[in-house]
């Protein structure tokens, strides 16, 4: 739905017609509304939950971000937070394209349904040719900043969603 849109059928008198409603305007990024929400309360199956950060495009939660202190391993964000959110508030992942887990020193991204082994670091901001300085990233706690600047800029995020997210429909490749 995010890439191709939704077909809406209308019937006027005896004539049936349809239109495609685009949920995201990939051709004109400025036509979309981007909203970042910090610690929004969401009613879950058993109680209220509060993800650290959600990024919405046109009201759809497309990016989930779980943040930890630098002393907490990123893997804990996956096992203690993301897995429980998936069970208790699964609706926030209906349109999710990216899950980010970070402690400032290490930042990983993956699909909401992926195992932790499929969450990977995002280290570059502008170019694949950039040299990675892991020491500087660790000293300045910039791994999450690199991801924000490198992936979550409006134009880049839309490009990533439109062109680099694989939608598994259960068919073999």
Where are each of the predicted segments found?
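ATP-dependent helicase/translocase motor core
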Residues: 1-173
């Amino acid at each position: 739905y995010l890439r191709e849109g939704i077909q809406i059928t209308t019937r006027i008198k005896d004539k049936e017609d349809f239109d495609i409603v685009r949920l995201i305007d990939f051709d004109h990024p400025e036509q979309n509304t981007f909203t970042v929400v910090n610690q929004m309360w969401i009613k879950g199956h058993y109680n209220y939950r509060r993800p650290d950060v959600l990024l919405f495009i046109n009201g759809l939660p497309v990016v989930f971000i779980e943040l930890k202190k630098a002393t907490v391993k990123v893997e804990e964000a996956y096992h203690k937070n993301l897995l429980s959110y998936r069970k208790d508030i699964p609706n926030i992942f209906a349109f999710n394209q990216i899950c980010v887990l970070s402690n400032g020193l290490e930042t990983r991204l993956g699909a909401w349904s992926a195992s932790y082994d499929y969450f990977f670091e995002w280290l570059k901001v502008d170019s694949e040719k950039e040299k990675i300085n892991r020491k500087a990233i660790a000293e300045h706690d910039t791994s999450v900043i690199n991801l924000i600047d490198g992936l979550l800029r409006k134009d880049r995020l839309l490009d990533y969603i439109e062109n680099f997210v694989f939608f598994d429909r259960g068919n073999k490749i």
